[in-house]
Amino acid sequence: MASSDLLSHLSATDRALFWKYGVGAEVSVPFQCVHHAFEFHAKSNPQLTAVDELGTTLSYGELDRRANCLASRLRSVGVVQGSRVCMLVERAVTLPVAVLGILKAGAAYIPLDGNIVSDSTLKHALVDSGSTVALTLRKFEHRLEGAPVPVVFLDDAICPSYNPSHCVKPRDTTTSKDSVYIIYTSGTTGTPKGVHVTHGNVTNLICIEPGQLGMKPGVRVSQMLNISFDFAAWEILGSLANGATLCPRGKTSKDWKAVMRSVDILFSTPSMLAPHNPVDYPNVKTVVVAGEACPKALADTWGARVKFWNACGPTEVTIANTMQLHIPGDIVTIGGPTPNNTAYVLDENMRPVPIGQTGVMWGGGAGITKGYLNLPDKTSERYVRDPFANDGSMMFNTGDLGKWVSNGTLQHLGRIDNQVKIKGFRVELDGVATAMETCAGVTGATALLIDGELWGFVKPSNISPEDIKAAAHKVQPYYAVPSKILTMDHFPETANGKTDKRVLQQMAIESKEEEAKLKEEKAAIPENVAWISLPPTVVTAPKTELTIPHRPSDHSLGSTNTKISAQVKEADSSASSTSELEKQEYIWSGYQDDDHPEKTQGRLVRNLRHQIFSLYRRLFSVVFIVNAAILIWICVKKEYDANRIGGIVIANVFIGVLMRQELVINTFFLIFTSIPSSWPLFIRRTAARVYHIGGIHSGAGVSSLLWLCLFTAQATKEMINGGKTSVRTVAITYVILAELLGIVIFAYPALRKRLHDTFENTHRFLGWSALALVWVQFMFLTIDYLPEGQMLGQTLVKTPQFWLVIILTCSVIWPWFRLRKVDVKPEVLSNHAVRLWFDYVTPPAGTFMRVSDAPLKEWHGFAAIPIPGRTGYSLVVSRAGDWTSKHIANPPTKLWVKGVPTYGVLKLVPMFRRMVIVATGSGIGPCAPAIFEKRIPMRVLWTAPNVRETFGDKLVDSILEANPEAVIYDTRKHGKPDMVKLTLRLVKEFNAEAVAIISNQPLTEKVVYGMMSRGIPAFGAIWDS
């Protein structure tokens, strides 16, 4: 019991409530070890499904067998009771095998996601944890090159035998006090700290209610979270320890939603859950959120339809030591202590505060972990003896502020120390201040989290905010660089001579209010004017004179107000800011001197492979060779009459037209880009070049022209010699030949560029008239060769060419059936570009649309830019000819559209795990959908002159919001870069699998060749038609 001194200051009521509220119920835990709970269900119900990854399943019996196999393999390479195994895997059906195999071997696992964990954290965890071995997948083999421990591959460790006696579980002496896992908490100062968690810590949460959350056989449980996050242990181990079915979410947003729709219990952070509407997930019965503060609106929305649990607890108290079942309309709290745990709210002297008053939250009981690995001083600082339990157990200082509310639950009120969460990451404010102090000339700095935004305060006042951010960005990741900076000559002080952070906070609030006034003045412009006619103006944030009064103190009573000159720079203000990334020349500083991978193979072989015999040309050649073989065959057989050659002409025209049909193109793209990113890279890099299918179109087009020349010659010969071919057929043939020659001549790249309008007109009208004449020629030729006594209709229906001509005609006509005139909402970005908004359809990412103001004369294709969560799409039209210049000067309010959204080269993005996306100028338009969609980690490189003046703050800011580490290179300021070398730097830094580029033809070909010749998959548009 607690000594009377610790509770003597409380009223009798508060003393009673201290015990009532702060001590959880005593409940017996049925299992002492996590894997023992799993084995109970594996033995009781071996046929039940343990894991279901989008249809790939493992039963409890098979999972148990595989885990035993892995445990035996680990024992054979030196793993013993008490060992630690670094587990570098990913969210998949194999994850439970790895976890249980390690536990059955008597070891603890260190969970690291091979797709996410940084090299520095991986190296630190391997050494700091004292791992006996590293367990990984073959796909992550490169990440463990030079590892200081043996590497075991999960892919190879499972024996093929289905005989349960083949791999016997090793002798098990694990107890509740042994380690189950070690979680490395993220930090921005120093190195990550490993937290030692025991089996007893975990089973106390997952094997009894409420932490059990109703998990039982037949219940489906989501596995949505990063496996390195301790919250993920709740869903993974909780499901397996209770006989439920664990459902990993897959790699795409489509898979993610499919899993969410299929589960009964959903684990999530509030940020992950926020975009989703519970109406869309009727199967979900229970949701538990943790990891960050939960907004009331989110809790109310989901709480109205499901059991909505809000949980809280740092890693050091085992995932969560308080939980609350939210009732819509009530305040959001984190509940009370879970069974066998305690929760205290104490003052600075470690005495309980009265109910309703704010203090520091401490946790105690069965969830308290062993402490920090290899950090005894840090452990003794945060873990202390629990004087209230008085049984020798420990309690932990969470560093969080909270208070007990009247219903006996805790209200979380933020952190008392300098560690905060920003965008889901832990950030040490002192580390941010230290990073800002690395800027030349800075004499002092501090950082505060104010209304969810990271602010930096720096002295003296003559330091550029952009220089401060550049310096901080060299030390800290993007999320730990202040988005707003205030510079001043002196910091306000408290009575004790310390920096008065309350006054600094007030300064920040007043500067935000001043900025809000400026925005309100801009917003007063009528909406229709803002949409159309005013190009954005980039202004510099003004110097703001702020008068901040000191709070009275012993040495400042009666003092006058202190005037502080503060320079405000807001990184997220579209009117007054430029992203720090646009101004940090160090990102590309010295890139031309980087050591780059050598080009593979000899120069001749490289050029043959990547330039002369590109996949496009190989497909062209295949079509051409097939036609050559057909020519040889009919010559040998002497079956080259005009009728047969005419059929071959039609077959080639059919293929050429169909390979440009929107539905056919989309089908090719959907099939080839559906290959998952888990497949070997050589398969994915080949399938991703599906956009080279234009080679089939060109091959068939050229072949049809050559066959038409042969047909013309043969038909003329037959006509002269009195054969079957009539004069009218030959006459029509010469007209068709002339039209096709005209199309081919104007399609020649040099002429097409110089005479683009002429090309458009000839290509369209000669193509239409040629199609009509093909019908006439076909009918004439059929009549010429009509067998005696047979009706024309009977012959036609039996002739394959007749049906080919019908199909290709329908293919050409079909898009015109989807012709419509739609409303356009223009947004003028500058005198160089306009953004056109449409709301009649929402196309998928990676597609382009055709628009026109004169549908019978010309059509123009632009990348469609859908915004996630918003109906409709936009197009970015930049100055590149008469048509674009006309619509930038006079933005349209209506345009014609036809056909369906058609996929382009960036449909391939989800096939890769990490990519560098390169765009020059308006090439950012086709790239934007993939950037906004955020389906994979990517690094964006955008080069253009004066991007904000050219494309406007709104587009630039949206790109930076979706990809905060995007590199924006101002060619007006820095000149034209060496795009190959700059791209190679980003590929190396980002550890990218592949590169995609949207640019002009010469630069696209240069970058693609520069990457491919070094073994890096690269993709860019083909200019073939």
From Swiss-Prot:
Binding site for NADP(+): R685, T686, A687, A688, S769, A770, L771, Y840
Summary of the function given for this chain in its UniProt record: Adenylate-forming reductase, a natural product biosynthesis enzyme that resembles non-ribosomal peptide synthetases, yet serves to modify one substrate, rather than to condense two or more building blocks. The A-domain preferentially accepts L-serine, L-alanine and L-valine as substrates. The natural product of the enzyme is not yet known.
Any GO molecular function: ATP binding
Domains as described in the record: Contains three distinct domains: an adenylation (A) domain that activates the substrate amino acid which is subsequently covalently linked as a thioester (aminoacyl-S-PCP) to the 4'-phosphopantetheine prosthetic group of the second domain, the peptidyl carrier protein (PCP) domain, as well as a reductase (R) domain of the ferredoxin-NADP reductase (FNR) type.
Protein name per its UniProtKB record: Adenylate-forming reductase 03009
Keywords, ordered alphabetically: ATP-binding, NADP, Nucleotide-binding, Oxidoreductase
Sequence positions that bind AMP: V332, T333, H412, L413, G414, R415
Pfam family, one: AMP-binding
Region listing for Adenylation (A) domain, in residue ranges: 38-422
Region (Thioester reductase (TR) domain), start-end ranges: 682-900
NCBIfam families associated with the record: AA-adenyl-dom (TIGR01733)
KW Glycoprotein (keyword) present: no
Family named by the database record: Belongs to the adenylate-forming reductase family.
PANTHER family for the chain: ENZYME, PUTATIVE (AFU_ORTHOLOGUE AFUA_8G01222)-RELATED, TRANSMEMBRANE PROTEIN
Classification lineage: Eukaryota, Fungi, Dikarya, Basidiomycota, Agaricomycotina
Region (Thiolation and peptide carrier (T) domain) residue spans: 556-638
Enzyme Commission number: 1.2.1.-
Cystine connections: none
